[in-house]
């Protein structure tokens, strides 16, 4: 993969880099200002001792003249100076004595004043640059491609057979999103959301180890059950074409489990089908397969799971970069070519594999890799927290921690640059999700550490919707409805929120600029310390976890879910290590 950077990297790019100079450049500049200011003060003070064209006597020569006034050379110098400057040597020494004292008093004051002026100027420049950056992100939107009145007229005339389909991807509806209601049933952070194929049910998984299946319209749970996991449930998904009878789940304990649901609205049982040696954050479903799916874990392993087999899981690939394993946070199958899948994790590369062509002896089995060129050799520890294919598989969206969201063309060659970039949010505190919204993937939606939900128009990269989504401070999960203009979200709060375009007027994006400024400042400050994912917020999570630990313990009853015999189907050891099972649930690490 090419590691060349664009030739413009050396210039100050507000969109791609920091708004201010590096600390080393700032300190060097201030030292230069101090040195020059000291010279200016000395020259101005000493110039008072002469009225001639000279820049002022040298301090060493002044001392020599004061100690040896009998020499002929000094007399000649003194005579000539008296003729030109009208001062005697003694007068000159007195003047210099006073000027030295004044200089010692004035220099610190001048230095402080210049430092203050320099800081004020730098602050003013940074603020102006930040304003320019925010303005560039909130410019006027282009004309919408879909308008309600002409579309309604066409439907009346029978010339538009796909009115609902087109309306769901219209900007005007997205700009009218408002909170409809919340679904309350969990006692911990809600880490995963997934609609069934018909869009009638919504599954949610939580730190409380439960999975709830909702009738989201009636605001009632259809069923809830213990997942069988021993730590935070990170994902729960309906397998397609299974009659909503099978749920696949993964969690922080590294287990991949399958739940069988009955028509009587209860969970018959759950069983473990795979075991990672680290947390498993994401599952990847094949669009039409009720039996097969993929899982990825922080152990860098991708499992392919076929429920028709006696031993369902088999190791597909171990993700590596130069013989070093790369822990994985996210995985997604290309909906247009189900042989291909993409993964992302603890480095800056999006990796695409083809299940038919994986040869770990050749390029570690990777078909191709993508990465924003400015991050290829960056010292910042970039991680991919989530990636997702568009509806037709032509585009690939990747969200980076403490960076931006990037759109790649999945058909481009290895090492290709991104084609779009989406900015304004903050992705630092958790493994945050990102998604497309709209039947044709017209929009990009992401949560943020500031507790807001951001929606960008994919084509223009402009923010078109901005909603307060979580009182706890972080929005992690965003799940679009498969057929309707509805969005489900969750985060640190213990409920699920349902959004629909029912507002009387389009959003005015109130407070957006202030939030963008705050997110940008915090990100720039954190980038100076090069903190790794989770480090800056781990203490906060641990404290939050300890406050809820006693409340969660009552859900950790033995004998729930799969029995020990079920674990025999795991491709790895059935005895998980202390590292895998021992830690209590850490609050809201996933999306």
UniProtKB/Swiss-Prot annotation:
Give the chief site where it resides: nucleus
Omega-N-methylarginine modified-residue sites: 198
Provide a GO biological process annotation: protein ubiquitination
| Residues annotated with Phosphoserine modification | 21-22, 99, 123-124
Top-level taxon: Eukaryota
Q: Which residues form a coiled coil?
A: none
State the pathway, as annotated in the record: Protein modification; protein ubiquitination
PROSITE patterns per UniProt? WD_REPEATS_2 (PS50082), WD_REPEATS_REGION (PS50294)
Q: Where is the composition biased (Basic and acidic residues)?
A: 1-14, 65-99, 118-131
Where would I find the WD repeats? Answer: 185-224, 228-269, 275-315, 323-363, 379-418, 426-466, 470-509
GO CC terms, sorted: Cul4-RING E3 ubiquitin ligase complex; cytoplasm; cytosol; mitochondrion; nucleoplasm; nucleus
Which keywords annotate this record?
Cytoplasm, Methylation, Nucleus, Phosphoprotein, Repeat, Ubl conjugation pathway, WD repeat
Is Phosphoprotein set as a keyword in this record? yes
Motif Nuclear export signal is found at 39-50
Q: Where in the cell is it found?
A: Nucleus; Cytoplasm
Q: Which Pfam families match?
A: WD40
Region named Disordered? 1-140, 552-591
Give the family this protein belongs to, as stated in its UniProt record.
Belongs to the WD repeat DCAF8 family.
Tell me the subunit arrangement. Interacts with DDB1, CUL4A and CUL4B. Interacts with KPNA1, KPNB1 and XPO1.
What is the role of the protein in this entry? May function as a substrate receptor for CUL4-DDB1 E3 ubiquitin-protein ligase complex.
What is this protein called in UniProt? DDB1- and CUL4-associated factor 8
- What species was this sequence derived from? Rattus norvegicus
């Amino acid at each position: 993969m090419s590691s060349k950077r664009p030739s413009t990297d050396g210039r100050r790019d507000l969109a791609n880099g920091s708004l201010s100079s590096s600390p080393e450049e700032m300190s060097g500049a201030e030292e230069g200002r101090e040195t020059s200011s000291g010279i200016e003060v000395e020259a101005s003070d000493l110039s008072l001792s002469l009225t001639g064209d000279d820049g002022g006597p040298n301090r060493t020569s002044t001392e020599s003249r004061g100690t040896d006034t009998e020499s002929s050379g000094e007399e000649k110098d003194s005579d000539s100076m008296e003729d030109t400057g009208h001062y005697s040597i003694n007068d000159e020494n007195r003047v210099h004595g006073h000027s030295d004292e004044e200089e010692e008093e004035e220099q610190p004051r001048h230095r402080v004043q210049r430092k203050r002026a320099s800081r004020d100027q730098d602050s003013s420049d940074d603020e102006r640059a930040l304003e320019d950056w925010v303005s560039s992100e909130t410019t006027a939107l282009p004309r919408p491609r879909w308008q309600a009145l002409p579309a309604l007229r066409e439907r009346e005339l029978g010339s538009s057979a796909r009115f609902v389909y087109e309306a769901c991807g219209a900007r005007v509806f997205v700009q009218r999103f408002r909170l409809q209601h919340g679904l309350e049933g969990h006692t911990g952070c809600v880490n995963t959301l997934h609609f069934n194929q018909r869009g009638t049910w919504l599954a949610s998984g939580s730190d409380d180890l439960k999975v709830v299946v909702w009738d989201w319209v009636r605001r009632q749970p259809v069923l809830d059950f213990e997942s069988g996991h021993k730590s935070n449930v990170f994902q729960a998904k309906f397998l397609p074409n299974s009659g909503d009878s099978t749920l696949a789940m993964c969690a922080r304990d590294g287990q991949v489990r399958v739940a069988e649901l009955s028509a009587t609205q209860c969970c018959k049982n759950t069983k473990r089908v795979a075991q990672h040696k680290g947390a498993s954050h994401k599952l990847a479903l094949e669009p039409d397969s009720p039996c097969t799916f993929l899982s990825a874990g922080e152990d860098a392993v991708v499992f392919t799971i076929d429920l028709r087999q006696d031993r369902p899981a088999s190791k597909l690939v171990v993700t590596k970069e130069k013989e070093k394993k790369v822990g994985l946070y996210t995985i997604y199958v290309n909906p247009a070519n189900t042989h291909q899948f993409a993964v992302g994790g603890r480095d800056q590369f999006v990796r695409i594999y083809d299940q038919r062509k994986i040869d770990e002896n050749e390029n570690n089995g990777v078909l191709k890799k993508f990465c924003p060129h400015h991050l290829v050799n960056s010292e910042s520890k970039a991680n991919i927290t989530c990636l997702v294919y568009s509806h037709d598989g032509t585009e690939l969206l990747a969200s980076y921690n403490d960076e931006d969201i990037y759109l790649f063309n999945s058909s481009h060659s290895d090492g290709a640059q991104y084609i779009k970039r989406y900015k304004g949010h903050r992705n630092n505190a958790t493994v945050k999700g990102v998604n497309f919204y709209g039947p044709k993937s017209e929009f990009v939606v992401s949560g943020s550490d500031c507790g807001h939900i951001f929606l960008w128009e994919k084509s223009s990269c402009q923010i078109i919707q901005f909603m307060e989504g979580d009182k706890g401070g972080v929005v992690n999960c965003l799940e679009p409805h498969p057929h309707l203009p509805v969005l489900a979200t969750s985060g640190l709060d213990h409920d699920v929120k349902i959004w629909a375009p029912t507002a009387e007027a389009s959003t005015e994006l109130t407070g957006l600029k202030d939030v963008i400024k705050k997110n940008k400042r915090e990100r720039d400050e954190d980038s100076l310390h090069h903190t790794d994912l989770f480090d800056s917020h781990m203490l906060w999570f641990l404290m939050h976890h300890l406050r809820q630990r006693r409340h969660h313990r009552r859900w950790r009853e033995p004998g729930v879910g799969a029995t020990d015999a079920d674990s025999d189907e795991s491709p790895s050891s059935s005895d998980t290590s202390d590292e895998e099972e021992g830690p209590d649930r850490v609050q809201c690490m996933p999306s």
